[in-house]
């Protein structure tokens, strides 16, 4: 990831976002409505809108995950470059459910981005954003500001790039889920699980 775009100012501002900026997420078909350039700009605008601390001004970071959609890894990489270009570190937790990303945001106390389009078909993808502690980002809590920054062109950042690291949160998340239910007194059951494409 170290050889990506330096900053967001090299991109043409994206217009006509009305169809993909929903109440609580960004969602559209890939690559017609949501592509790598837009993901890059959303990453930079997310950092700016939330005022996430840069490497030379604190210890800010964004945790990012994606579901099983084929476009996920490429969109995540571009979003991460947008975040890095604004001087903020990136923590990649890889393939995860939305609840898994929210758990990571809460456990690490960091803002997060989940690449998913929920129930929509595979040609769709989207970005659910949250503040530190898994507080949702909606139109009235950041999305409108992100839209304004993208429309105007995300300002360039001249400080050092953020760094990227991977972190496995699955074991911690599984332990957290097991703590929610006391199975010590449960009778023997046979359970069938539909893993939903692994998610």
Regions found by a protein language model. Name each.
Residues 24, 66, 116, 193-196:
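Active-site flanking residues adjacent to catalytic metal/cofactor-binding acidic residues
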Residues 27, 69, 120, 134-135, ...:
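Short, glycine-/Ser/Thr-/acidic-enriched flexible segments
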Residues 5, 9-79, 85-86, 166-189:
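An N-terminal, well-structured beta->alpha segment
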Residues 125-199:
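Gly/Ser/Thr-enriched, mixed-charge loops and adjacent short helices
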Residues 55-132:
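Ferredoxin-reductase
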Residues 27-30, 96, 128, 198:
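Gly/Ser/Thr-rich beta-alpha loop segments that engage phosphate groups in nucleotides
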């Amino acid at each position: 990831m170290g050889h990506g775009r330096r900053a967001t100012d090299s991109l043409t501002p994206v217009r006509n976002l009305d169809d993909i900026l929903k109440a609580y997420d960004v969602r559209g078909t890939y690559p017609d409505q949501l592509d790598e350039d837009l993901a890059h700009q959303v990453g930079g605008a997310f950092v700016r809108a939330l005022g996430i601390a840069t490497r030379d001004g604190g210890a800010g970071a964004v945790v990012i995950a994606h579901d099983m959609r084929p476009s996920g890894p490429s969109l995540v990489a571009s979003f991460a470059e947008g975040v890095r270009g604004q001087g903020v570190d990136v923590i990649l937790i890889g393939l995860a459910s939305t609840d898994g990303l929210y758990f990571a945001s809460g456990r690490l106390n960091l803002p997060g981005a989940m690449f998913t389009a929920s129930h929509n078909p595979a040609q769709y993808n989207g970005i659910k954003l949250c503040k530190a502690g898994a507080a949702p980002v909606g139109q009235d809590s950041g999305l409108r500001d992100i839209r304004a920054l993208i429309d105007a062109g995300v300002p360039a950042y001249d400080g050092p790039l953020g760094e990227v690291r991977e972190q496995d949160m699955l074991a911690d998340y599984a332990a957290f889920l097991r703590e929610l239910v006391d199975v010590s007194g449960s009778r023997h059951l046979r359970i069938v699980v539909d893993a939903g494409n692994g998610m």
